[in-house]
């Protein structure tokens, strides 16, 4: 019996020592920058796309920056280096693929809370989420690490005793340091950026059947109220509470194939009404610059720019930054009526079946329009 107790004590003692070592290693390296500023003189930090939700919190709290690029996959290919050059800023990028308006707004709020130097925010307003549920959180894209965002220290157990954090982050960073890998933070241009993809009509449309017409449904009162709530609570409230920060927002330019699917589903009218609501709510806000390029045919009607119905190539991200810096595509009280009229005319009258006639791109890369 005594021998059994000794073995039990030895086992428990060993287990506690091992747990303490894991906790100590995670806290000391802190790969997600949860506790402190990154130790850029000791370790190599390389934010990974598969851990976007986990590392964004630490980046926003502990990196040095005065500009923020934030959003979903619509922002993943946006380059901090180009933003720095165009706007004369020092930017970071925090992205979360498929995130809701609530989640992206929470990242903005976190940055504004912890960084009084923040003077510029660039964000894409995903048009698919205009009328989503007010507190929507998209778990289908992966778990949301609440323990990294709340203020409950007891929840940190999910971080400091996390197998993925240990094996995919701490140990590789420790080995890099031992092997003399240059410490620092990897280029955030690459954070979340896609590998080379296949673009063109076949990839964008992913259909063989022709587009059909349908009776269009008007926007319901319930959806209208959701749109107004979302834009007021997740866009305007942040800008109004931070008058010294300038917010560059843009409507994410989806392809004509997406608009064709909307029309076939009878949702084109509702989508146009939602967009108009969003625009008219935002325009009076003095520190928001709202941009849209939905009516630029060389962009939205050329499927060589898209790998699916909504995701555009990295050259589009570059172009949009350049457009924002030069003020092109800015919506104002003087041009909004012409823009809304032009957009409605384009997407209501376009023959979407002509999209099948577009040739496949000869090679990967930006169409000529974006090379001018």
Can you say where each PLM-predicted feature lies in the sequence?
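Alpha-helical transmembrane signal-anchor/signal-peptide segments
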Residues: 29-52
